[in-house]
Amino acid sequence: MSIPLEQPENVVVLRQTMYLLSLMTILRDQQTGHSEFVRTANLIINMLMQEALSALPYKKCLIKTSSGGTYTGVQPARDICGVSILRAGESMEYGLAAACNYSVPVGKLLVQRDETTFEAKLMFCKLPKDAQDRLVLLLDPLLATGNSVILAIQTLINKGIPEENIVFVNLIACNEGITNVFAKFPKLRMVTASIDPELNANKYVVPGCGDFGDRYFGTC
């Protein structure tokens, strides 16, 4: 089980139930096959989307029920959109769409990491045309050094999206990455399923789960 350090107050970690821990065990196991990896990842992603959407602002609304009564409920107070960091972030798009009745626009960012310097470079950016007026869920399953996510967040800010309107949704993070990201963006909000203690010499999360994109899309 991962042992997180004290985290910024804007970081929400899913409740570490036995069920979630069992899913994380399957996800991390190098013996887990492709179809089981995808099934397990999707279950965790669904949990993350529920938590992320619960953190967004809501407003009261009055509806009529099929029984002839009225009900005071809530509905989102702001429109949202997703932005996935390619390619691994695309694995989280279906979970977001399913949680929002498939009506949420999704943008794409391609950020590549130099395997020698570990620096990130923006290669492609396509956002929904009104992204600056929406709350943005930034999707990337793994957070290692934080360089790619920092570049992605700065790109969103440069496009007119306020830092406080960005929620980073993530499966596995590490302490170093969280520290680096929040040192630059303290108003950011983050939802993750697990926080691992360290990076290895190649700057991969340990214990981690391997290359998430390769395992999810079956290219390993």
Swiss-Prot record:
Cofactor, how bound (note): Binds 1 Mg(2+) ion per subunit. The magnesium is bound as Mg-PRPP.
GO biological process: pyrimidine-containing compound salvage; UMP salvage
Family matches, as CDD domains: PRTases_typeI
Known pathway: Pyrimidine metabolism; UMP biosynthesis via salvage pathway; UMP from uracil: step 1/1
Catalyzed reactions per annotation: UMP + diphosphate = 5-phospho-alpha-D-ribose 1-diphosphate + uracil
Binding positions (D-ribose 5-phosphate): 204
GO annotation, cellular component aspect: cytoplasm; cytosol; nucleus
Binding site for GTP: 77-80, 134
Cofactor(s) the protein requires to work: Mg(2+)
GO molecular function: GTP binding; uracil phosphoribosyltransferase activity
Residues engaged in binding uracil: 205, 210-212
Keywords linked to the UniProt accession: Allosteric enzyme, Glycosyltransferase, GTP-binding, Nucleotide-binding, Transferase
Enzyme superclass (EC): transferase
Description of how activity is regulated: Allosterically activated by GTP.
Record EC number: 2.4.2.9
Ranges that cross the membrane: none
Positions bound to 5-phospho-alpha-D-ribose 1-diphosphate: 87, 113, 140-148, 211
Family note: Belongs to the UPRTase family.
Family annotation (NCBIfam families): PRK00129.1
Its biological purpose: Catalyzes the conversion of uracil and 5-phospho-alpha-D-ribose 1-diphosphate (PRPP) to UMP and diphosphate.
Protein's recorded name: Uracil phosphoribosyltransferase 2
Species of provenance: Schizosaccharomyces pombe (strain 972 / ATCC 24843) (Fission yeast)
